[in-house]
Amino acid sequence: YEKYIIERIDSVLFQSYPIYELIILDDKSSDNSVEIIKKKIDDIKQKYPNLIVKFIPNEVNSGNVFKQWKKAFDESTGDYLWIAEADDSCSRKFLENIMKQFELDDKVVMSYSESLTMDENNKILMDDLREWIDIFKTGKWNNSFIDEGHDFCENFLCINNTIANVSSLVFKKDKNIDFDKYLIEATKYRLAGDWYFYEKVLMHGNIAYNKNSLNYHRMQSNSVTLTTKREKEYEEICSIQSDIINNYNLSKDMKQRLEDRKKSF
């Protein structure tokens, strides 16, 4: 992450929408990220004296990214939380647009934007992720929308994780949602805990989507899908889809689509 961490931090600091708290988590990086972050924080404190800045490095790798998510929720003091992953980036208008969607509907608990993908050298690979997300070619993501959480899960999120990258998303820390419980449960998943967490949160509110690619998701060219990883992913997908069936009112047709999707995997 050392190659991208400064760009990531700056992409947060340079937002057109004001931020009040910056929490940087490091999960025992094996590179020089900690030293780079410490030096950057000294600079931040001089330039942004009113910004609350926390740096929390782990002494031992947690082994599960969702433990870090939980720490972010535990440590943050604001009403909204943006988990900005270390190797991603974004438009400086990202937060401005995402936060507007909360203002349009006070029941929105998750607000996100479309994402483009880029490589290690910031070369754009895909202008958006609609081809990945909209597997049944519904056209759902061609326009911005606000959906009731249950409807979104029963018609879209039940099939696949339609929120491809957590960096594209801001959560409202609604006091009626037991984020702590759901994140502890999410840690039992190695690959699909984000999907599990989203469907749990959406039991309690609505979701908003901005069609513009305001989030920049970095794809690592050396990432490899191993057979064992594929098998684990399939196992977790089946588990999450079963949980959705138990907690949501899926139509007969949608349940059949779930079965067909499992077979194609």
Feature annotation, model-predicted:
Residues 1-4, 29:
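Donor nucleotide-sugar binding loop of glycosyltransferases
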Residues 10-57:
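Acidic donor-binding segment of Leloir-type glycosyltransferases
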Residues 57-76:
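Glycine-rich, basic loop-to-helix element that forms the pyrophosphate-binding segment
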Residues 81:
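Short aromatic/hydrophobic "clamp" motif used to bind/position activated sugar donors
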Residues 85-89, 114:
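The conserved acidic donor/metal-binding loop of glycosyltransferases
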Residues 90, 132-230:
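Conserved nucleotide-sugar donor-binding catalytic segment
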Residues 93-135:
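Conserved donor NDP-sugar-binding/catalytic core segment of glycosyltransferases
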Residues 229-237, 255-265:
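Non-catalytic, C-terminal membrane-associated alpha-helical segments of glycosyltransferases
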